[in-house]
Curated annotation (Swiss-Prot):
Domain of life assignment: Eukaryota
Naturally occurring in which organism (per UniProt): Grammistes sexlineatus (Goldenstriped soapfish)
Key words of the record: Antibiotic, Antimicrobial, Cytolysis, Secreted
One of the GO BP terms on file: defense response to bacterium
Function, as annotated: Thanks to its amphiphilic alpha-helice(s), it may integrate into membrane phospholipids, leading to lysis of the membrane. Has no substantial hemolytic activity. Has antibacterial activity with a broad spectrum against various species of bacteria including both Gram-positive and Gram-negative groups.
Name of the protein described by the UniProt record: Grammistin Gs A
Tissue: Expressed by the skin glands.
GO cellular component: extracellular region
Length: 28
């Protein structure tokens, strides 16, 4: 079950990183 948890964590981290990068590009 920990693999599913790890996958979910990685997916969440990737999404968070994407939003942070988008914010930086928009001038934050």
């Amino acid at each position: 079950w920990w693999r599913e948890l790890l996958k979910k964590l990685a997916f969440t981290a990737a999404g968070h990183l994407g939003s942070v990068l988008a914010a930086k590009q928009s001038g934050w």
